[in-house]
Amino acid sequence: SASAAMVDAGGNGGNESGTGVSGVGGVGGAGGAGGLLFGNGGDGGVGGDGGDGSSTQDSGGDGGAGGAGGAGGWLLGNGGAGGAGGAASIKVATGGLGGDGGDAGLFGFGGDGGWGGRGVDARFGAAGGAAGAGGAGGWLYGDGGAGGVGGVGGAVFSLSSGDGGAGGAGGGGGWLFGNGGGGGAAGGGG
């Protein structure tokens, strides 16, 4: 990515060894915006993984959502990429949502959408998270960002496997010039 420094990732959810509920992964931080006139938006942080469930609970922690990419500078700058969603726990849980890519300024490329978090192989299949959308290209000139790829559903040997997450939409091209970003592929079922 042509974006600025990465933002902190979300923390992982705590693991539960008793009968309580496992922690949800933290949300990744949003990328900062580019300067008033020039500058690229920062990338969004990655979402934290959900905490593992114990043998006495059927539900673990969901993966945290990825942070959104920052917008590019008003005149010239690329949008930051969205952060990837965190993975689900080893029990029934959903992968985190991918963050949306940031929009470009008047000139620049939209940031790519973050990938959806994966479901984890378990006794029950965890669903993959939906991917983030690509950011819009520059208003005058620039390509839209690509949509992220949906998270893969968790595979299991009994009961139901998890569904794959939806792919993200591609960002629109510039109002005058620019190509639209491609849509992301959906994640496969477990």
What function would you assign to each model-found segment?
Residues 1-190:
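Long, compositionally biased tandem-repeat segments
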